Amino acid sequence: MEKMEKIKIKVVIDTNVFISALINPNGIPGKILDLIFEEKIVNYTSPSILKEIGFKCLSPKLRKYLGNENRILKILTAFSSVSVIINPNTNFNVCRDEDDNKFINVAYESKAIIITGDKDLISLRDENKYLKINNIHLKVPTPKEFIEEFEKFIS
């Protein structure tokens, strides 16, 4: 009998979750990034998300927290290597902040959870923390909500 492979949770983390994880690796976003690097969850992303993350991480404002450019580029390369990079075919326009639509597009195509602290994305979810698009329900937890549920899931 074949051994069943564990199903891994698919996620899309927004830029602020990634940056928060780098600034405070011991915080909740840091735990999420650890889960991605340990390949306990699968992160889905896109070239436009990676570009935004890179742009923000390399900004002078954040470099004082994140270190020199070489260190940041190594982290971004490592993050890319453990992520599934897709080019979504969908192009939803449901967010007040148009830049946030890219997270929805990736999550929709990959059937992933969007982990975010972004107020615009959170405002789109229903009372059960789901965003419904074209009969697809995308879970949209905050980092804290995700970790709480993940810990229940694995225990």
UniProtKB/Swiss-Prot annotation:
SMART domains with a match to the protein in the record: PINc
Name the domain of life: Archaea
Record-linked PANTHER family: SSL7007 PROTEIN
- What protein name applies here? Uncharacterized protein MJ1680
* Source organism of the structure: Methanocaldococcus jannaschii (strain ATCC 43067 / DSM 2661 / JAL-1 / JCM 10045 / NBRC 100440)
